[in-house]
């Protein structure tokens, strides 16, 4: 089971502060059942100006610490990119999640629709697949999904409980259909954002935060999460864990075990056909990182 979104790397953003904090978080994630964890610090211009190489190196170091502690977790490097007016500065050197083509991203609290859409277009143009974090917590994405109605239903995918129970390959089927789509229209070439009425690329996936279903972010987000879940908007599930002390509230085993939708999303591995990425490492990078 893979956690696609954590802030487990120490002293890089608003997540873990020390290595001890990171190890405590890792132990909680392993106890919950995760076997692989994506290390995804924020990438925000002027706040967290991180480079892919910094994240790779930090991931390697923490992996060594976990191995020494006997914590059975596979760490994948990644970033959580902010889709704002500065995102284009990072788009030339994007860091996907491990050996997938998934690029984790989020919208600002006061999102400019044009910049968000332009950011999604840039990710797709670079050959990656946007994985949007916690749309239930973001007004822009929540309202867009509601406006579109049955999100995945519009693409001909059956996300009803019966279908999920009968077919354990429904997610892979979704991905195959998704990538058979024709290429979207290219973004504008000037430095202005796309017009707010432009449609986002169809090759956009969404992950839910497990804590959204447990009430960690409050009742409004909890309602939003269940509403999007009913619409079939989500492809994957993540903890978005920032600190060890919140693990008890976020990683609620009963909530996870008793909900077939959440269970199914947790089985998504992000390495289905057409998502795999050929990893080419230069000198100084280690294959063991992946």
Predicted regions and their residues:
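An N-terminally biased module of ancient metal coordination in phosphate/nucleic-acid-related enzymes
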Residues: 1-70, 172, 289
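C-terminal regulatory/interaction regions
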Residues: 173, 177-182, 246-249, 275-290
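Short acidic/histidine-rich active-site segments
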Residues: 233-249
């Amino acid at each position: 089971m893979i956690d696609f979104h954590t802030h487990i790397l120490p002293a890089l953003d608003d997540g873990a502060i020390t290595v001890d904090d990171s190890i405590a978080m890792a132990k909680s994630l392993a106890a919950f059942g995760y076997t692989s964890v994506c290390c995804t610090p924020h990438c925000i211009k002027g706040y967290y100006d991180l480079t892919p190489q910094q994240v790779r190196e930090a991931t390697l170091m923490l992996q060594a610490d976990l191995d020494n502690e006997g914590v059975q977790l596979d760490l994948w490097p990644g970033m959580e990119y902010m889709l704002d007016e500065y995102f284009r500065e990072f788009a030339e050197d994007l860091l996907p999640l491990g050996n997938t083509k998934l690029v984790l991203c989020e919208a600002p609290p006061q999102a400019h629709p044009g910049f968000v859409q332009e950011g999604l277009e840039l990710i797709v143009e670079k050959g990656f697949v946007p994985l949007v974090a916690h749309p239930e917590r973001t007004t822009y994405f929540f309202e867009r999904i509601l406006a579109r109605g049955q999100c995945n239903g519009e693409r001909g995918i059956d996300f009803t409980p019966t279908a999920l129970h009968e077919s354990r390959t429904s997610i892979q089927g979704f991905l195959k259909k998704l990538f058979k789509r024709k290429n979207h229209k290219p973004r504008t070439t000037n430095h202005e954002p796309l017009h707010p009425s432009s449609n986002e690329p169809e090759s956009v996936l969404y992950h839910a935060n497990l804590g959204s279903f447990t009430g960690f972010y409050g009742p409004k987000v909890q309602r939003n999460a269940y509403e999007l879940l009913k619409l079939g908007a989500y492809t994957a599930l993540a903890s978005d864990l920032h600190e060890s002390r919140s693990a008890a509230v976020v990683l609620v085993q009963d909530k996870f075990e008793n909900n077939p939708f959440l269970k199914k999303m947790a089985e998504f591995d992000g390495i289905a056909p057409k998502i795999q990425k050929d990893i080419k490492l230069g000198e100084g990078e280690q294959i063991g990182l992946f």
